[in-house]
UniProtKB/Swiss-Prot annotation:
Cited NCBIfam families: asp_carb_tr, PRK00856.1
Family named by the database record: Belongs to the aspartate/ornithine carbamoyltransferase superfamily. ATCase family.
GO term, biological process aspect, one: 'de novo' UMP biosynthetic process
GO CC term, one of those recorded: cytosol
Protein name (Swiss-Prot/TrEMBL): Aspartate carbamoyltransferase catalytic subunit
Binding positions (L-aspartate): 77, 160, 211
Quaternary assembly: Heterododecamer (2C3:3R2) of six catalytic PyrB chains organized as two trimers (C3), and six regulatory PyrI chains organized as three dimers (R2).
Length: 304
């Protein structure tokens, strides 16, 4: 079966196939199942974009959606994630979409369950569908990855988006740079080079900003965030020095006037809401791949 757990498990060919399917969906192609097929969304962390994007994608494909609430489930009675998935599998669910606060929650599950797991984000680890929608957005803009210079800016240590994107974009031929406060650098992420933000601003093709993840920090104070914006955020002054034709990206939710000046969120360079739109098409493509017998997706097996 075709789990989607991390970007490292996808070859360049597989990435290209998923992006091609996503582009087809973006251009109006329809694909709907004619048989009743249940898919469950299990979100153990809060989500707006990923959760609803998956649900829209599922419904566009004609799938029947089961939205799981941990607070109202037997998880509150101590049921394990494995038993929860096996329960859903037993009652006829054909795939599960999971977001979980634990890094690599899927390691012990992937060989024990008989339905595809689509990782919607694991702790500070991986976020493959966010990466794929970012790749689609970049491809739409530049038509290529080879030779592009991309800055990933902000809370690199705690960002699953940074980890997934840096690895995939490097594989596809882009050059990755990081800019981050010293305490938020991730020395384990070896797919890019750290440089000062102000050096990168006029050089890069893509300015990919990361959310300050205050829920993963001990404190979140207004004065600290103001200082962050001035030192590490995309201010109006920095945007004015950006390279001609370069774009701004952000996985959202956006902390306005922290990672990016509020007036830049929907400026001409910004592709933030385009990323959200592309999320639906990418997740349709990922679901097609996971359910080939139902949706006519890719029939080769991805070994994980």
């Amino acid at each position: 079966m075709s789990h989607l757990l991390t970007m490292s498990e996808l070859s360049e060919v597989e990435i290209s196939e998923i992006l091609k399917d996503a582009e087809d969906f973006a251009n109006g192609k329809e694909s709907k199942t004619t048989e009743q097929t249940f898919v469950a969304n299990l979100f153990f962390e809060n989500s707006t974009r990923t959760r609803f994007s998956f649900e829209v994608a599922e419904k566009r494909l004609g799938l029947d959606v089961l939205n799981f609430s941990a607070d109202a489930s037997s998880v509150q009675k101590g049921e394990t994630l494995y038993d929860t998935i096996r329960t859903l599998e037993s009652i006829g669910t054909k795939a599960v979409v999971i977001r979980h606060e634990q890094d690599r929650y899927f390691d012990e599950l992937k060989d024990q369950v008989n339905i595809p797991i689509l990782n919607a984000g694991d702790g500070c680890g991986n976020h493959p569908t966010q990466c794929l929608l970012d790749l689609l957005t970049i491809k739409q803009e530049f038509g290529r990855f080879e030779g592009l210079k991309i800055a990933i800016v902000g809370d690199v240590r705690h960002s699953r988006v940074a980890r997934s994107n840096a690895e995939a974009l490097t594989k596809l031929g882009a050059t990755i740079y990081f800019a981050s406060p010293e305490e938020w650098k991730d020395e384990d992420n070896t797919f890019g080079t750290y440089k000062p933000l102000d050096e990168l601003v006029p050089e890069v093709d893509v300015m990919m900003l990361l959310r300050v993840q205050h829920e993963r920090h001990d404190h979140y104070e207004t004065d600290i965030m103001k200082e962050y914006h001035e030192k590490h955020g995309l201010t109006v002054e920095r945007e004015q020095r950006m390279k001609e034709g370069s774009i701004i990206m952000h996985p959202a939710p956006v902390n306005r006037d922290v990672e990016i000046a509020s007036e830049l969120v929907e400026c001409e360079r910004s592709r933030i809401f385009k990323q959200m739109e592309n999320g639906v098409y990418v997740r349709m493509a990922v679901l097609k791949r996971a359910l080939p017998n139902v949706l006519g997706g890719m029939k080769h097996e991805l070994l994980v």
